Amino acid sequence: MSNSTVGKLKGFIASKGKRTKIAVAGGAAVVVAVAGYLLVSSYASGFFVSVDPENATVTGNASVVADASASGGKAVQFTGPASTGGGGGTGGGGTGGTATCTGSANTPGGSDGMGGCWPGSNNTGVPSGTALSAYTGSCTITTNNLTIDAKTINCPGDLLVRASNVIITRSKITGHVVVDTDVSQGYSLSMTDIEIHADGDLPVVYNGNVNILRANISGGHNALECQEHSSHCSLRDSWVHDQWQAPTGDTHLGGVAHFGEQVACTGTGTNGMTAVCFDIEHSSVVCDAPVNASGGGCTGDINMIAHYGPIPGAFIYKNLLSANVGASYCTYGGEAPENGATRIVYQDNIFQRGTNSKCGSYGPVTGFKFSHAGNLWTNNKYNDGSTITCTAADECL
């Protein structure tokens, strides 16, 4: 969507009623009625608008514009940050208009070449202007369908989720977030417009059954790590960066990781692909920790390594993978000595070349086998536009 015209509410000029505050959630259709008059559903991203139908005024991220198709000839036009579309049918890219980006093209926050911006500091995390208050609830969540909004969450250990359908929005979290799928595969968590930072040699968010949208995640040895009892793991329109690093020791760091399944996968990609275990879409995935004194450092940006079981489905779509000569490869495609990977789809991703022109120390990708059923490598390119060609060998060069 465009950063200017992302949708209109039609017909409010002709209606009568009290001032109404309209919250339009990112990627969701919203229908608003004022004094019995149906306005119109629209798609938008993080907008909060006050409409005064009686005086025909509107304030917030919107303006009144002429529209011959609207009742009364006028409509409300929303304005604001471009949606990258991670919750929509195209999987991100903001192809509906020209977005206002920060930084160079094909860097976090910069142009993604698809009419939108890569996720970065300018378009992830808590929306600007959000007033946060301290979270006073338990750091072990056991209430199903709980929603936490606009909070600062500081748990001395972990924020532990032992409930289903927990939702956290517009919040800043310090510490690790754990969905305890080892206890129950029914536990699940969704997080939108959040900032999370955690120190120490653990993932920031793990074990799985999690959907993350427009997040700014830093620290940990992985931003998101999905393990064997996770039925789905999704990261969209998000920025992961600045991993924790010890001064010495054999550290193995990454952006996001999946280490194999022992349960059936239930996720769905925006292309309609079903039974997806690991869904990473339109995200800036950066492993930028330096190599330490012992040679420990980044394994890669997106790492699928089937240690604990096979990986039977992954959708890696329209992501920016950051170059780091300290990393072996920028992505691992699922293979491991213990298990294999099938239905692994890499599509329309951009790999930074970096200083050695190969993204990682040895190349862009390893552990991806064409011989396994459903594996697909299509239209993946370096940031200079050149195609990364894969052959039927184990590695792409």
Tell where the protein language model's regions lie, with residue ranges.
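N-terminal Lys/Arg-rich, disordered targeting/topogenic segments
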Residues: 1-16, 281
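Extracytoplasmic
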Residues: 13-25, 35-85
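Ser/Thr/Gly/Pro-rich low-complexity, disordered linker/stalk segments of secreted
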Residues: 82-114
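Extracellular secreted precursors and ectodomains with disulfide-bonded cysteine-rich loops/domains
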Residues: 99-100, 115, 137, 263, ...
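N-terminal carbohydrate-binding/catalytic regions of secreted carbohydrate-active enzymes
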Residues: 112-201
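Extracellular beta-strand/beta-solenoid scaffold signature
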Residues: 133-136, 155-158, 174-186, 193-207, ...
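Right-handed parallel beta-helix
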Residues: 145-152, 165-175, 185-198, 208-221, ...
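Leucine-rich solenoid repeat scaffolds
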Residues: 350-397
